[in-house]
Amino acid sequence: PKAIRRHYFANSPVMSHLLTALSSTFPIGEQFFVHSVRNVRDQVKDDNLQAQIAAFIGQEAMHSQAHTAFNAAWRRDDYNLDRFQAWLARKDDYVKNLHPKIQLAITCAFEHFTALLGGYILRHPEVLSTLDDDAVKLWVWHAIEEIEHRAVAFDVYQDVYGDDKIRRLIMRS
């Protein structure tokens, strides 16, 4: 990431800041997604779904590490990510005190969103065509993995809770 230009997305400060802001949410977000699935993992009896959960946890951990490294590069340019990430950490503390069903519903919503975003990126490679090569590699890799495990949180939710009321409510919020 150290080689990535400051305005790495279409040479645009706005688009670069937008993508960097999105990236800065991933380490805490990915950790929360893992937490929400682990909350109920012991209730899942299906071996295939357990294997998918294990893969999901591994992929989310890799995403968190990759985006932590990507985000660290922006401190060189005096991006103030620490204040934003402190705000995210306070929100994370709040949602981790919600009922596990609500936490998993939140994860379902975000995983759905990131899979849609990942699908868009892969169907429209021109969107990322103006990024530095290292940035393209990060975002395309992350997009592929989001699509690969897009249904895991949903499948866990259905397996454990079997209803849509809370999940749909959270999805609309």
Ranges and model annotations:
Residues 1-173:
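Non-heme di-metal
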